[in-house]
């Protein structure tokens, strides 16, 4: 996020992408996200409470520290009823802008807004042990089978899980001699 970008608009697009990677929002959901959709609980934690644009299903996501930092960056810039990220253009033009961000950052792939949502589902949550049911609710999926598409488990993850299980079971079960 310390990459120098050619203009302010490209920075907003980058920030929106990173915010989606840490909240799971889709392009259509972040494009309509207003400050009124973000609530503070009794502990001072920020939550997005909204309905999916695509399905109308309600979802709730607690902001992780990076997402909270990005939210606060824009919170005082725009009024409460206004959108958190004042995105301009279409899904296609935003993805074209993300290509410029990737080029400035020296990345060898072209990120898309859907990749951000996919990253949240796989790398940020499921790979870190967040239960599939929780991820499904945060993504606003109506059926858990939709979330299972994101849950392709790698051999590394299986190995890590079995090592953790082995440590938990160590000494509990014994084979008779």
Segment roles from a protein language model:
Residues 2, 23, 32-72:
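Conserved tyrosine-mediated DNA breakage-rejoining catalytic core shared by Y-recombinases
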Residues 52-56, 139-164:
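Catalytic-site neighborhood detector that most strongly recognizes the C-terminal catalytic loop/helix
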Residues 1-27, 128:
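Basic, Lys/Arg- and aromatic-enriched nucleic-acid-binding interface segment
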Residues 29-31, 110-112, 121, 129-143, ...:
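Active-site-proximal segment of tyrosine recombinases
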Residues 53-72, 80-100:
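C-terminal catalytic core of Y-nucleophile DNA break-rejoin enzymes
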Residues 77, 165-177:
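C-terminal secondary-structure termini that scaffold catalytic or DNA-interacting sites
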Residues 13, 44, 57, 79-81, ...:
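Exposed loop/turn and edge beta-strand positions of beta-sandwich/beta-sheet ligand-binding modules
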């Amino acid at each position: 996020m310390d990459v120098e970008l050619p203009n302010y608009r490209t920075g907003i697009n980058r920030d929106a992408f990173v915010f989606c990677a840490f909240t799971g929002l889709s392009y259509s959901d972040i494009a309509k996200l207003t400050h009124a959709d973000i609530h503070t609980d009794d502990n001072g934690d920020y939550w997005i409470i909204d309905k999916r644009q695509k399905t109308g299903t309600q979802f709730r996501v607690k902001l992780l520290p990076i997402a909270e930092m990005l939210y606060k960056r824009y919170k005082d810039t725009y009024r409460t009823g206004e959108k958190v990220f004042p995105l301009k253009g279409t899904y296609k033009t935003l993805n074209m802008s993300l290509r410029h961000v990737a080029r400035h950052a020296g990345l060898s792939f072209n990120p898309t807004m859907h990749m951000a949502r996919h990253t949240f589902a796989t790398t940020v949550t499921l790979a870190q042990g967040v239960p599939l049911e929780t991820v499904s609710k945060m993504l606003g999926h109506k059926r858990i089978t939709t979330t299972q598409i994101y849950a392709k488990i790698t051999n590394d993850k299986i190995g890590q899980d079995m090592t953790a299980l082995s440590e938990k079971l160590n000494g509990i079960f014994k084979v008779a001699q």
